[in-house]
């Protein structure tokens, strides 16, 4: 998939609208707690500034439901962006109207203007054409660098592309290049590492990627649905009964297609209060047991399977990572993948958070900024924010 790149646009002295995803956590004072997504957009912003563009940044934050709400303001984001760029960031209190028009008209080459939260207008999520046209009138070129919002057909993601020449920013290009590699031309052997609580989040992903991979290792609470499909006692562990049939079918397809599937088979088990912690094999589970993390045997088996791989896509923590008692599986497999000689791509918000917490971020080829967007891309869907950027032929 080839996208029209920002490199192909003549940006000098042009008003360039950049859709970024600055949907970051804030503290009670409105200060940025985690600037991962802001940092990810810096290469595009810096390129535009260096090349003399007048940069107009547009983002959403949270879900203010189409109403102005101070706790979802981007003022704190502007402050953090100024610190990261060592540069003044101008701030407009809206994305449409006289104030933002005056601010845009006053921009000089190399200036950066961040507009207030676009989701303060309900027209954004409705993909309202008139609203998109109004915002488009502020600029001469549109750049989408918000991969993580590109599975939404919103006014500043998809609608705006009908009114301006549209290009991909560097983050968008990087995301699409790495994720396309996973579906089109991975180095083999190619393995998935899957965790998290729900199979339901990954049904389409599994259906699309099973024929493309050489194997997968499955941990997290989702593995209990696979064990139930094989008739095992899983105690009170999380299970999706309506997907037991799907899990059974997937395991059968994997066998037919000669794919290696490694299910976590021992667990860090506790009761509902997360007390009385012990290690148990799946075959020893009692009716009250709950598995909260993969056990040492599973960690060893996962490593033995993954050591063969050249490409790995990891989506989902392997245990209840936010509780230190149940973080060992994610930590050990994460550390193993961080030292892995092949290409590892990490996708999903919880997995990215775990990788950052373990301070392994820089060790991976790519940590995707997109949770839902990266999964939908890997499911084979054409994302509404990306389709207008694709070079035909």
Curated annotation (Swiss-Prot):
Binding site residues for ATP: 202, 291, 322, 348-351
GO CC term (a single one): cytosol
Protein's cellular compartments: Cytoplasm
GO biological process, one term: gluconeogenesis
InterPro entries for this protein: Phosphoglycerate_kinase (IPR001576), Phosphoglycerate_kinase_CS (IPR015911), Phosphoglycerate_kinase_N (IPR015824), Phosphoglycerate_kinase_sf (IPR036043)
This protein's record includes keyword Nucleotide-binding: yes
Keyword Phosphoprotein listed: no
Domain of life: Bacteria
Reactions listed under catalytic activity: (2R)-3-phosphoglycerate + ATP = (2R)-3-phospho-glyceroyl phosphate + ADP
Pfam families: PGK
Pathway note: Carbohydrate degradation; glycolysis; pyruvate from D-glyceraldehyde 3-phosphate: step 2/5
Cystine crosslinks: none
EC number(s) per entry: 2.7.2.3
GO molecular function terms noted in the UniProt entry: ADP binding; ATP binding; phosphoglycerate kinase activity
Keyword annotations of the record: ATP-binding, Cytoplasm, Glycolysis, Kinase, Nucleotide-binding, Transferase
Binding site for substrate: 21-23, 37, 60-63, 119, 152
Record family assignment: Belongs to the phosphoglycerate kinase family.
PANTHER family attached to this UniProt entry: PHOSPHOGLYCERATE KINASE, PHOSPHOGLYCERATE KINASE 1, CHLOROPLASTIC-RELATED
UniProt subunit comment: Monomer.
Name of the protein in its database record: Phosphoglycerate kinase
Organism: Coprothermobacter proteolyticus (strain ATCC 35245 / DSM 5265 / OCM 4 / BT)
Lineage of the organism: Bacteria, Pseudomonadati, Coprothermobacterota, Coprothermobacteria, Coprothermobacterales
Gene name of the record: pgk
């Amino acid at each position: 998939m080839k996208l029209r790149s920002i490199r192909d646009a003549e940006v000098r002295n042009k008003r360039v609208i950049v859709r970024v995803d600055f949907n970051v956590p804030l503290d009670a004072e409105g200060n940025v707690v985690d600037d991962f997504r802001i940092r990810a957009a810096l290469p595009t912003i810096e390129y535009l500034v260096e090349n003399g563009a007048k940069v107009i940044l547009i983002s959403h934050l949270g879900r203010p439901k189409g109403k102005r709400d101070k706790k979802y303001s981007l003022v704190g984001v502007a402050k953090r962006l100024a610190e990261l760029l060592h540069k003044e960031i101008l701030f407009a209190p809206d994305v449409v109207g006289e104030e933002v028009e005056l601010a845009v008209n006053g921009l000089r080459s190399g200036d950066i203007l961040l507009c207030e939260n676009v989701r303060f207008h309900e027209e954004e999520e409705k993909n309202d054409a008139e609203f998109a046209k109004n915002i488009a009138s502020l600029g001469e070129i549109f750049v989408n660098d918000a991969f993580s919002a590109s599975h939404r057909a919103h006014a500043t993601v998809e609608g705006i592309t009908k009114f301006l020449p549209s290009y991909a920013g560097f983050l968008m290009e990087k995301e699409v290049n790495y994720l396309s590699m996973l579906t089109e031309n991975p180095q083999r052997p190619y393995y998935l590492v899957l965790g998290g609580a729900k199979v339901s989040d990954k049904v389409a992903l599994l259906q699309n990627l099973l024929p493309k991979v050489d194997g997968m290792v499955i941990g997290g609470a989702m593995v209990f649905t696979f064990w139930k499909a094989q008739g095992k006692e899983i105690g009170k562990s999380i299970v999706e009964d309506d997907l037991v049939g799907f899990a059974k079918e997937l395991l059968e397809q994997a066998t037919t297609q000669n794919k290696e599937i490694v299910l976590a088979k021992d667990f860090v088990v506790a009761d509902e209060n997360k007390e009385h912690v012990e290690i148990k094999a799946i075959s020893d589970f009692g009716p009250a047991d709950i598995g909260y993390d993969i056990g040492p045997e599973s960690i060893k088996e996962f490593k033995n399977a993954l050591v063969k791989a050249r490409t790995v896509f990891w989506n989902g923590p392997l245990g209840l990572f936010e509780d230190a008692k149940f973080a060992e599986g994610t930590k050990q497999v994460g550390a193993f993948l961080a030292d892995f000689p092949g290409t590892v791509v990490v996708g999903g918000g919880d997995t990215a958070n775990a990788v950052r917490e373990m301070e392994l971020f820089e060790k991976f080829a790519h940590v995707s900024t997109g949770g839902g967007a990266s999964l939908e891309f890997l499911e084979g869907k054409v994302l509404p924010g990306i389709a207008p950027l694709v070079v035909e032929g």
